[in-house]
Amino acid sequence: MSKKFFENIDQYSNEEIAYHVIKQFIGDEIPKDVLYGIIKNTVHFDFPIIPINDSISTLELFHGPTMSFKDVGAAFMASCLSYFNKNNNKLTVLVATSGDTGGAVAR
C-alpha cells in the first residue's frame, strides 16, 4: 500500500478502504464491480473508530449482526464462496469454535 493511501485514508469511505486493502490479495480474480458489491455486503454495519487518548484509537468490529468481530471475515468469506460457486454446488463449511465464530459463520 502506498504512503499516499495512508496519508489520505480519512478521505476514503469504509468500502473504498476495504477495496484498496483486499485488492492487494485478490488481484483480478474478482471483477472490480463484483468485489465492491461483496465489500458493500460485508461492511454494511457501523464499525466506529473510538479514541482512547490523543494518539490511540480502537476499531469496534462488534456492531454486526452477531455482535462479533468475526462478522466481517465471515460475511466476506461467504460472499466470495458464493461468487466462486457459479454452479450452485452444495458447499460445506466446517468451523471449529469456542465462542462467537459459529454464530458469525452460520449467519
Predicted ranges, named:
Residues 1-107:
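PLP-dependent amino-acid enzyme catalytic core
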